[in-house]
């Protein structure tokens, strides 16, 4: 949950984020090992063993932007996505590399991975030293996993936790929920999206006076949605639920 790393001073805790990503990679590898013998088909077990694919993802991106006072889809939000994405992929790769000390590299590992456009794109002026160290360690020990990061829609999980789903914007600031009883009685009641309820409504800010940086899928231009996804998928595989305004043209 990216929103959890926003501090009370409206900054992002990159140190805590890095530590969490590394621990999550370790945890997912433990889950993979625990579940490996439970696959019913030998082909499945061999695939898991040979490729060791995990999928650490994110949710709460929209909530994070609201906490930071940044408009989803703005140029500033793209800069933040690049900073967070860079830290996430570096930390995940470093953790997977460190795991090879105890678990070894995944059997299908090939050193040519460091020559791929994806890996080489990490070599920027700001991250050159970190990149060179990572590259050397990968050539020396390999990686424990062939795949590391995957951003799922997280619809059910995020709703259960009361946070924004995956990397999507919030779909509305409020909505109407209906319940039905066994005697066919309906009850309609208004529900505020948790981030709106907690950060504004509960503090006396009316829904019609929310800050301009609070946007929903109904009022974000589809081009900005695409820019957000394009920025994020430089670092992580994305499964994206593209909620759009009703009047958006099919093209």
Question: How would you describe each model-predicted region?
Answer:
Residues 245-251:
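A short, hydrophobic C-terminal helix/tail in secreted or cell-surface proteins
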Residues 1-48, 58-64, 68, 163, ...:
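Function-dense linear segments that define catalytic or interfacial modules
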Residues 11, 15-18, 79, 83, ...:
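Charge-dense, low-complexity intrinsically disordered segments
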Residues 20-45, 49, 53, 71-154, ...:
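Internal maturation/activation junctions in enzymes
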Residues 28-37, 128, 137-144, 149-244:
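Catalytic alpha/beta core of large soluble enzyme barrels
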Residues 3-6, 42, 55-57, 65, ...:
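Generic, ordered loop/turn and secondary-structure boundary motif
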Residues 74, 193, 248:
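Residue-level signal for threonine
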